[in-house]
């Protein structure tokens, strides 16, 4: 029998995110892309088969960096591209691992970041130490500390996610939102916002409720839209339990389109939350809030808008139908997903 299929209609995020200025593509894209691709090729050849490497080319993660960070200088942009490539490779690898294997990988990452003399001979260790030395060692002390702390939390959360996946456990909405913020690695990419802008916010700014409100809104916007765009591939791999669409369907007892519509409405509210946080901080007298923190929130707007643009410019989520889906907003949900590729293929 042919596979059953259904369709969903995606929200028009372009309209929602039009409140954020479109600052276009970073002018250093071409040069930094070639350098970053050469760098990640040293590592993904160790674990990726030829088909997965071709898929990676079509995803064009370097384009993501150029859209997320349009203001970065060439060195900063290179760092963002390297990080996005690194995170993709780590995510694809751990998607196929058991909880024990994912926890072991997390241990390697943590040791590579925190112990200068650690070297277990693995490609993961080599990649992390190389990235840290090239980029994070040059960041401000607050940013560098947060980056290492956030990276260790991220890989630990990925290990926990592998355990939830094995048990087919679906979290409630509140728990999922907090958990997704950690498994998304967005704290790392947001740390690079400060690195690229040459701003090293003190921790008390991060702890400020208004800044935290804007920060969390930006994180959730990217998390929820990515979940929505990746749902088709994840359900095909049997990983849909760790996706906000599935979480909403279960928690609210609704069908898939109602869950998608809920995501769209919630993203409108999150957009307003980010804009409001910027407005409040702009009115403060202290420069660290009215200038530096505001600039960071504005850059988060670049990230949110750039993420939506890249999702349809790349074949990451919708394959060769990306441009058709962008126009029609219609996604056909099919199991099994015909062009799904294993990392070692």
Swiss-Prot record:
Positions that bind Mg(2+) 3: 226, 230, 234
Binding site for (2E,6E)-farnesyl diphosphate: 316-317
UniProt keyword terms in alphabetical order: Lyase, Magnesium, Metal-binding
Gene Ontology molecular functions: metal ion binding; terpene synthase activity
Enzyme Commission designation: 4.2.3.-, 4.2.3.88
Reactions catalysed, as given in the entry: (2E,6E)-farnesyl diphosphate = viridiflorene + diphosphate
SUPFAM superfamilies reported in the protein's UniProt record: Terpenoid synthases
Function: Terpene cyclase that catalyzes the cyclization of farnesyl diphosphate (FPP) to various sesquiterpenes, including beta-elemene, viridiflorene and gamma-cadinene. Gamma-cadinene is the major product of PILCRDRAFT_825684.
Notes on the domains: The DDXXD motif is important for the catalytic activity, presumably through binding to Mg(2+).
Protein's UniProt name: Sesquiterpene synthase PILCRDRAFT_825684
Organism annotation: Piloderma croceum (strain F 1598)
